[in-house]
């Protein structure tokens, strides 16, 4: 199993919430949290990133969890991953294709960014949403949400 987890976030508020969860689960010896942009120092066998799913400019702190301005987190994760992975390590990218259904990013652009970063896709595991919004007809994004797939992209240095 995993002996040590380092979690990072740029938001002090998000880190406080995460620390509350770490404490509640009594995982303080295994999990440390750092305020950092993407990667902690050093290398790791596994690095997981769940960036905001939509390219766009957040208008509030809350929207920073939804909108990734200039795709900073997504592209930063991909471009910095090889430097931070231990030999034979993997990067796991958790990403919805909602942006593709809304015409905000193409699958080809995502695959090109992966390739530019010198990474290869080992596997992609997909799941469809089961949350209530996926079935809400009044939602203006109902068609896109019904078509949405969230994927775990297993990446490695090529």
Language-model segments: what does each one mean?
Residues 1-3:
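Conserved SAM-binding loop of SAM-dependent methyltransferases across substrates and taxa
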Residues 8-150:
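S-adenosylmethionine
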Residues 153-158:
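C-terminal lobe and adjacent flexible extensions of AdoMet/dcAdoMet transferase-like proteins
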